[in-house]
Design a protein with these regions (language model features):
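Glycoside hydrolase catalytic-domain context in secreted enzymes
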Residues: 1-254
């Protein structure tokens, strides 16, 4: 998998041990006598490979075209690079609402309009997933509308505003685009961590919208000092717990 938002975000270069008997997919990690190659460190007995990805326009710029057909073509271009670099899952697009112009990741998101956000995200999804083996992850589900204290902020929102503004774009993307996965957000929604919300993951996404793909947590969602512990994420309906607290699996998962 690879992150977004403006195309595929990969390490500029990686190395493969010249004498490795076997390597991981794409040779990102090659085996050495003392373990795997350290990324970002040059080694004498290794070949260096460079990865040049296209820097596509960011989400806000794309949305200003109001052109769903163009967004589908953009998605197809992303999928071509995914195939080239053996990436199966793109951790994008981000499609949170522009609630405040000071949000640190507004550039990544499409718009303050949930309809526009949803329709354009759906077009991108269709483009990417038109190629077999290429999938999309829409994020951050939901109400991730600021970067400052994003792991602890509580988004207090009425049911009507939640449905009509902050979830509407995701609903359209799910129903019109059928993404492979959804990534939950760090923040709380009305006092409950989004990744711990069964109402959000199971009732809304799966039962109401009919989503049948994978739901995953964001990286470091389950850090030790946070209230969003792994068993709560699993119980809420997250299928995949992304890396965070090293003791997650041993200490908590069985409690789900």
């Amino acid at each position: 998998m690879a992150d977004g938002p403006a195309g595929i975000r990969l390490r500029q270069w990686y190395e493969v041990d010249k004498e490795a008997d076997s390597i991981y997919e794409m040779g990102v990690l090659g085996s050495l006598e003392n373990g795997i190659l350290e990324p970002g460190v040059h080694h004498e007995n290794a070949d260096t490979y460079y990865q040049y990805c296209t820097a596509f326009p960011v989400g806000t710029a794309l949305a200003q075209t109001w052109n769903a057909d163009l967004m589908t073509e953009f998605g197809k271009a992303i999928a071509e690079e995914m195939e080239e670099f053996h990436v199966n899952l793109w951790l994008a697009p981000g499609m949170n609402i522009h609630r405040n112009p000071l949000c640190g990741r507004n550039y990544e998101y499409y718009s303050e309009d949930p309809y526009l956000s949803g329709m354009l995200a759906a077009a991108v999804i269709r483009g990417v997933q038109s190629k077999s083996g290429c999938g999309v992850t829409i994020k951050h589900f939901a109400c991730n509308n600021q970067e400052d204290n994003r792991m602890g902020v509580d988004s207090c929102v009425s049911e009507r505003a939640l449905r009509e503004i902050y979830l509407r774009g995701f609903e359209i993307a799910v129903k019109e685009g059928n993404p492979v996965s959804i990534m939950t957000s760090y923040n709380l929604i009305n006092g409950i961590h989004a990744a711990n919300s069964k109402d959000l993951c199971m009732t809304v996404a799966r039962k109401e919208w009919g989503f049948d793909g994978a739901i995953m947590s964001d990286w470091n969602t389950t850090v030790p000092e946070d209230g969003s512990v792994p068993w709560k994420c699993v119980a809420a309906g997250n299928d995949i717990i992304m890396p965070g607290n090293p003791d997650d699996c041993l200490l908590y998962t069985s409690d789900a």
